[in-house]
Amino acid sequence: MRLRIAILIDDFYPSSGGIGRSVETQLEELTALGHEVTLIAPDRHLQKPRIGRVIECPTLYVEGLPAHLSILHWSKRRARLISEVASFDVVHTQTERGALGLGARIARLQGIPHLHTFHANIAGTHQTVHGATFGTLGYQALILPGLRIARGGGRAPSARLPAATSETGGLAARTDWKSFATIAQLADAYTVPSPFMRDLIDEAAGRRLPGYVVPTGYNRRMKRAIDEAPRERADGAIRFLSVGRLAKEKRLDVMIKAFRRAALPHAELVIVGDGDQRDRLKTLAMGCDSIDFRWHLSSTTALAYEFRNADALVLSSYRFDSQALVIAEAVSAGLPVMYCDDRLTVGVSPRTALLTGPDVASMAQGFRTLADGPLRASMAAASAELMPDLAPARTAERYVEAYTDLIERKATRG
């Protein structure tokens, strides 16, 4: 069955980090499966994809602010205008701002199911970003009431705080999961990239909701670039690689301290990325010639070169990432992975990755463990076992299964 799918996103496309990359994969892979995909995205900073259809939507946004503060217009009029030019079989929203309300209105107008994907673990921001509480309050004061209005009113679904043992990030973090559980019940179903997110949402809802775990697979262009990149190292050093934003929640300060404590001869740490922690991290690395900052690499070829010439990927975030897409990229490059967040289960296994504690001493020991060449070689070889489940086509197939299930259930309910 050929489906007509509307994908809605508040963030600028495609330059908005992991969410933009996930949406890009969805567009490409769903189209490759023969489905008709329409992207409804902000009309600012838009780089139109060469496939599918694009409907540009006005957005509330002040230039210069972060992209996650962009809000699509979600009025009844906007939903009606879109419905006059396009009919869909399913609406799939990707962000919890204007896109969520607009998607709900379109679904209601056209009598079709509404699927929502929770990409980000916003509950993980509270441990390092002090202003994150304002986001929690924003959900309670604006997003949830707005979504109820878009759905046509009615009683608010029941939700509760998950247990403090399930979410250890404090009251604000537990409140975020309660908000997610409310949103999940106001949509027809939801998806998440990792099992732990589904468990927390369903716990907050007090019951098992219609939900699906759909990890984002590796990017085909990145995989092709990695395969084509030359391996140009003959120095004999062990190169550990970190890729991502230089932000507090990524805890690169812990990584740098751990690497320095490990004091490995003939080892280097290459850090790719940029962000507001740049100066602090440079200061922490001062005097250590084996730590090299490559800053932001916008070229796929340049980033692929770093993966190809590394010996292991290191991830230091803890209780923040929802999936960590960089793990899928590391697997596609055949790299062992060292990480410290036990809730991350996508793209890792005991044969391919080393789980450490989140503290400096534990990560330092992890660096020492991965200094073992035969161990790294064994882990790299085992990474091939994970590739089929991380294939981007598998991501699209899982979404189609969810769409079909929702459409059939809605038809049965009449």
What are these regions (language model features)?
Residues D89, D188, R308-S322:
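Acidic donor-binding loop of glycosyltransferase active sites
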Residues L375-L390, E401:
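A short, well-ordered alpha-helix in the C-terminal region of glycosyltransferases
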